[in-house]
Amino acid sequence: TTGDTYHRAINRLPGHCAGISWPIWMGILAYVPGTMGLGGIFGGAGQSLSFLGSLAGVEIDGVLCTGIIAIICSIILSTGSYKWLESAMLPLVVGFTLATLTCVVAMQFTEFAVSPSEIISGLKPDWTLFVAFAALALSAYGYTGTSSGDISAYTYWCIEKGYPTYIGGDRDDAGWEQRAKGWIKVLHNDVWLALIIVTCATIPYYILGAGVLNQMGIVPEGNDETISALSNIFTQTLGQWAVWIFSIGAFIILFSTVLSGAGAGGRPIPDYLIEMKLIERSNLALRKRIIRWYLGVLPLIAFLIYLFVPNFVILIM
């Protein structure tokens, strides 16, 4: 309602170190593992592209594919004009999600069918499994858009869209409070709706993994085997022809995640510098240049990380 950025508001919290609020310092510390995770997503996108190429009879090294994707993302993000790409990818991502839901339904008519009792038993807490796989499960769920970085990026997106201007800056206006409450209600509904959609879109992957991969005894290991092993959730439920749907959908989802993740991650960078008194908030031109240069370099850094640690599962964890 104030138009303030996320980090400017966070920096007002009590508990400062060297003049900066401790959540800001925590965010800076989290930058390294966050960038490593982005390198893992780049690696996954590269491996999915390599797998797609192999289906077409074109063998391309996964690392090379990752490098190509990093360069393409760097060019797209540095221009700042990728709305057309987001618009094109949205229906494809929705289509792949619907295909995954179809796989869950189709699975019930195969040897991999799961009973309601099995689903209920799977919802019961198992602390042994939690300790063993908590990091992987939480990190995987976090990359669906529920991490603190995504939450902060959402606020920047709202400001860039100009939504706070609908409320107005004059708090003495008789209708200001009513507009502010209405806007906050819209945000609440938006967040709840997003949470429901993300959860409903994520659960089918867990069900397919437990129902198909677990019963087949498949444990994906290594970059080359992981994408191929995961394709079984489609081929074993819909048929071998569905490997094309899986490979194309997996690439689109990972590529769109790379674009949105890197694009969102660039917005807070000038804000960090402002709160650390390194640049002036009023210098809008400099802030835009920083974002553009950062978004041009970030994909290349993520690729270098993957080059040194060529295992996207480990990086995402």
Task: Give the location of each predicted region.
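Membrane-water interface regions at transmembrane-helix termini and the short interhelical loops
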Residues: Q47-A56, I69-L92, C103-T110, I305-I316
